[in-house]
Amino acid sequence: MKGILPKPTLLELDEYDINQRVIEALTTTCSHAVLFSIVNVEKDVVEIANELQISLSSTYKALTNLEKLSLVEIQRFKITDDGKKIKMYRSRIKKADISINENNSKVLLYPNNY
C-alpha cells in the first residue's frame, strides 16, 4: 500500500528546513543589517533602529526572527532610571558562509567569541 499523503516536493521540504530559514534571514537586507550591527557590541532595539535608520517595528521583527533561529541572544537586561527593563542584544555569529548547488544548500556559521 502506498503512503496516504503524497510525497512532499523539494520546495515544500525546503520551506521548513532550518538551513533555508537561516539563509533567508542572512540574505534579507534588514535582518542581515541588524545581525551584523551587533557583532562587536551589544545594543538595544532603539540603538539598532537609530543606527540603521529603520523602523522600530522592522527592528523588532528582525530580532525576533533572528532570536528564534539562535543567531542572536539577549546578552543582558539594562534597567533604566525609571525602572524599565531593556533587552541588550548581541550576535552569536561573526561570519556566515552559504553554499548552494543544485538541490542542496549548506550554511556554515562562525561563532562570535566575545
Protein language model features and the residues they cover:
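Short, Lys/Arg-enriched N-terminal segment that forms or immediately precedes the first helix
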Residues: 4-24
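Hydrophobic residues on short alpha-helical segments
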Residues: 23, 32-38
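Short capping segments at the starts of secondary-structure elements
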Residues: 29-31, 40-47
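A short acidic, leucine-rich amphipathic alpha-helix
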Residues: 47-52, 66
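Conserved segment of winged-helix/HTH DNA-binding domains
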Residues: 80-114
